[in-house]
A protein has these predicted regions:
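Juxtamembrane transmembrane-helix boundary motif
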Residues: 1-53, 74, 80, 104-192, ...
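Residue-level signal for conserved functional micro-sites within the alpha-helical transmembrane segments
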Residues: 57, 94, 98, 121, ...
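Transmembrane helix boundary and interhelical junction motifs in multipass membrane proteins
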Residues: 60-69, 198-208
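Juxtamembrane transmembrane-helix termini in multi-pass membrane transport proteins
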Residues: 66-110
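Interfacial segments of multi-pass membrane proteins
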Residues: 68-82, 206-221
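Transmembrane helix-bundle signature of multi-pass membrane transporters/permeases
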Residues: 84-92, 223-234, 290
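Conserved small/polar residues in nucleotide/adenosyl-binding loops
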Residues: 347-354
Length: 357
């Protein structure tokens, strides 16, 4: 028995090593002959950005695009379209490696959330590329990114500091899974997919922030689940940009391969660090990062009074949405408890009647 476990463990290690060798081979023989190693001398800020970017993608549920997008747009002053395509490209490698690692190591995920949110996300990415991307300006993309990050921050803050009691009743899978649950997950995935089509990230953030609240699924289970959603969404988004919607931004195509060897090292390091820290420490780090990101957006864009009112209204609407979501979750949870109590009581009554006869 012990030998069998040792063999299985060694097999997993071999598969992971082969996966990393395969990715490095693609980078070394597929991308670098076209790009050239001298690109590191002229584009060094991009791979340097992905050192913290890759770490954050492993340390939190956010993909590497959550770091690269604001840094590229606000610090390096690069085009938002380039930042979006870069995020899709680098996540297609980094998040896919993470997803394969999760599956090989049999880390617990909520399979139904992964399946239906991913299906919804792919549909949303296509829809967003057709109807939303053509009308989005770079300025609006930056504001939208801050709204997505703010949504995550609000849900994280409320879940951690305002509704502590509900954490006693979290579960590893969605209880009372019905057809309407499938519909809800498809819609959640669709919304995340639309954001991903515009920003290069978002499917994981939206799925995580809503499912943890609405269905009370354990964050430790949803974290790897959201990685799988974002991995498939990134690959789908990149392929759509390449073959359906006119190709990816030329600067992104020449830049994201430079960061591939970095993210496949930094992301696992981030995951290891996160596993050793308490949840509250990770939450505080995330909230600090989110406040800095939102503050830098308002500072860099110099919004007019009317724009500030619109953004403020959106943020207020976001708060209201999550409070409603929390209350709906409370009602949904209490109703399920009452139904379970009735079901158990009815079963006991029938058993008593049968034994009496």
């Amino acid at each position: 028995m012990w030998n069998r476990r040792k063999i299985m463990k060694n097999r997993k290690k071999v598969v992971l090593i082969l996966m990393y060798c395969f990715v490095v081979s693609i980078w070394l023989f597929g991308f670098m002959p076209k790009i050239g190693f001298d690109s590191y001398l002229t584009k060094y800020p991009i791979p340097l950005t992905m050192i913290p970017g890759g770490f954050v993608s492993g340390f939190t549920i956010c993909g590497g695009g959550a770091v690269s997008f604001p840094v590229f747009c606000k610090v390096l002053k690069l085009d938002a379209m380039m930042a979006r395509d870069f995020a899709l490209g680098i996540q297609s490698f980094g998040m896919t490696c993470a997803a394969i690692t999760i599956l090989i190591r049999k880390i617990k995920i909520e399979k139904r959330v992964a399946i239906f949110c991913t299906i919804g996300s792919i549909i949303g990415i296509f829809f967003g590329n057709v109807y939303i991307v053509p009308i989005m300006s770079s300025e609006n993309m930056k504001i939208l990114f801050s709204m997505v990050i703010a949504a995550f921050g609000v849900s994280l803050f409320l879940n951690t500091f305002c509704f502590k009691e509900r954490r006693k009743y979290i579960c590893e899978t969605i209880s009372d899974f019905q057809m309407k649950t499938v519909g809800a997950l498809l819609i959640i995935g669709f919304v995340g997919g639309v954001f991903t089509s515009v920003l290069g990230t978002g499917a994981d953030i939206i799925a995580f922030s809503i499912v943890t609240i609405l269905f009370r699924v354990d964050e430790k289970v949803l974290n790897p689940t959201s990685d799988i959603i974002m991995a498939v969404s990134s690959v789908a988004g990149l392929l759509m940009r390449m073959y359906v919607f006119g190709g990816i931004h030329k600067d992104a195509a020449a830049s994201f391969p430079l960061a591939i060897p970095i993210v496949i090292i930094m992301a696992p390091l981030g995951a290891i660090m996160a596993s050793k820290l308490k949840r509250l420490s990770v939450v505080k780090f995330l909230l600090f990062f989110i406040v800095i990101e939102i503050g830098s957006t308002f500072y860099s864009l110099q919004l007019g009074n009317s724009q500030k009112i619109i953004v403020g209204s959106l943020f207020a609407g976001l708060l209201l949405f999550y409070f409603i979501l929390f209350k709906f979750s409370e009602i949904y949870y209490r109703r399920n408890i009452m139904e379970n109590i009735r079901s158990v009581s009815y079963t006991h009554l029938r058993a008593h009647e049968t034994s009496a006869h």
